[in-house]
């Protein structure tokens, strides 16, 4: 039986996954980033780690059959299907401090960030708030040029594109439908993400 959830624009979602369950993350309308983090269900010290994943896979890109690794270098999830092929493992989740520095926004100009969305989603499971979230940013199109310069470009995902991940251990996971509504990150608008668990 498949369970289905909608992550509304600018909102988050937290779930428990059992080892072997399949997680499908769908870009409903296209060009919408979904930040994703994962924690070991019984030991919150162990969590999805960008650096360990890059190191273990010898690549800044995750390909089908690659694992997403924890900070203890253990496989947490396996990418089993991907209709886009471009996601981000380099940048931290957006947060108020980032909005002030990169977008010149003042405190009263933003209400939601991926950092806050995922913290709220994880709170129900007792996961403590980290100093920062370093997510697998699904559908995010981060470009690294030959000089080492980074830029965030419009996502390559179209309506209905998806990734499927298999849990390799019992997990607590969280998503954020990225709230950045101006600029290329989400194609100048913010839309929904659909999550299916089977």
From Swiss-Prot:
It comes from the Bacteria. This is Uncharacterized protein YcgI. It comes from Bacillus subtilis (strain 168). The gene is ycgI.
């Amino acid at each position: 039986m498949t369970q289905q959830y909608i992550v509304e624009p600018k909102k988050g979602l937290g779930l428990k996954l059992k080892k072997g369950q399949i997680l499908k993350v769908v870009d409903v309308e296209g060009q919408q980033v979904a930040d994703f983090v994962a924690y070991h269900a019984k030991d919150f010290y162990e969590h999805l780690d960008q650096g360990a994943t890059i190191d273990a896979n010898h690549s800044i890109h995750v390909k089908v059959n690659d694992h997403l690794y924890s900070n203890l270098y253990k496989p947490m999830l396996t990418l089993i299907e991907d209709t886009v092929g471009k996601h981000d493992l380099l940048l931290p989740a957006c947060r108020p401090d980032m909005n002030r520095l990169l977008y010149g926004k003042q405190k009263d100009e933003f209400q939601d960030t991926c950092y806050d969305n995922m913290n709220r989603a994880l709170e129900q499971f007792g996961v403590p708030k980290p100093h920062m979230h370093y997510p697998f940013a699904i559908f995010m199109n981060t470009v690294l040029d030959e000089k080492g310069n980074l830029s965030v470009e419009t996502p390559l995902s179209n309506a209905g594109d998806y990734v499927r991940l298999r849990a390799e251990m019992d997990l607590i996971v969280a998503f954020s439908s990225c709230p950045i509504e101006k600029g290329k990150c989400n194609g100048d608008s913010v839309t929904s993400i659909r999550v299916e668990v089977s």
